[in-house]
Amino acid sequence: MSKIETSGPVVQVGDARFANHLPLTLIAGPCQLEGRQHALEIAAALKEMAAGLGVGLVFKTSFDKANRTSGSAARGIGLDGALPVFAEIRETLGLPVLTDVHAAEQCARAAEAVDVLQIPAFLCRQTDLLLAAAATGRAVNIKKGQFLAPWDMKHVAAKVTEAGNPNVIVTERGASFGYNTLVSDMRSLPIMAQVTQGAPVVFDATHSVQQPGGQGASSGGQREFVAVLARAAVAVGVAGVFIETHPDPDRAPSDGPNMVALRDMPALLEELLAFDRLAKRRTA
């Protein structure tokens, strides 16, 4: 199992297609939805970049960071404030949108304005949440918990598919390794694909370099290793890569230490696409 099998299901999200044997797809955007104009500007910049490189794009952002280290940390604008922004990004820019949900009752409302519901890593085994997300018919991206073995995702993904929704994506975002540290085991990528019957596998390159609680009242991160881990994962042959980005990461309200500066995204993605072509034996 040196790399992911070159066949399997395809999850269509707007114009983007996720499959382990197809060209790499990008999920990107700011960690937190900070406001309408901020989100639109980032989404427009990412759209232009993706179009220039010929890569599928799903815009991501979070309306609520419900698991912040400190109760006093900024959480976001909330679902009510986010829904019009999500809808505007879809309608004016033509981009599919992904956001995370934290409670079963959020799923149907979020699904009105987004294309992908994301299950946070800490909540990946919450059956009611998974079933509610599945019931919307939207694609469901499940982050593998930092506490799970990759083969445990078999049963997690099955909760969605057995509920009648085949549009499942599974994402690796690191495993807990001692205190305030995550490590990435690249073996997990083909293992997750195998145990989920070929579900598209995504590598979360920015949360994988997070240092949970590493700054006391907030999480730290090592963004200098984002490209290192992303290259390794894409070389395995994944369906997509997840990268949080911001115009000024050091001033972002959450996850700044592990986000990639927006200006650095084109060069990083161009490099990753070269690795993707090599992994999937395609020509430029």
Curated annotation (Swiss-Prot):
A Pfam family annotated for this chain is DAHP_synth_1
Give the UniProt keywords, A-Z: Cytoplasm, Lipopolysaccharide biosynthesis, Transferase
Describe which pathway this protein belongs to, using the record's wording. Carbohydrate biosynthesis; 3-deoxy-D-manno-octulosonate biosynthesis; 3-deoxy-D-manno-octulosonate from D-ribulose 5-phosphate: step 2/3; Bacterial outer membrane biogenesis; lipopolysaccharide biosynthesis
Which top-level group of life is the source organism from?
A: Bacteria
Give the location in the cell.
Cytoplasm
Q: Which GO terms describe its biological process?
A: keto-3-deoxy-D-manno-octulosonic acid biosynthetic process
Transmembrane spans? none
One MF annotation (Gene Ontology) recorded for this entry = 3-deoxy-8-phosphooctulonate synthase activity
The enzyme's E.C. designation: 2.5.1.55
The UniProt family comment states: Belongs to the KdsA family.
Q: What is this protein called?
A: 2-dehydro-3-deoxyphosphooctonate aldolase
Instruction: Please report the organism this UniProt entry assigns to the protein.
Output: Methylobacterium radiotolerans (strain ATCC 27329 / DSM 1819 / JCM 2831 / NBRC 15690 / NCIMB 10815 / 0-1)
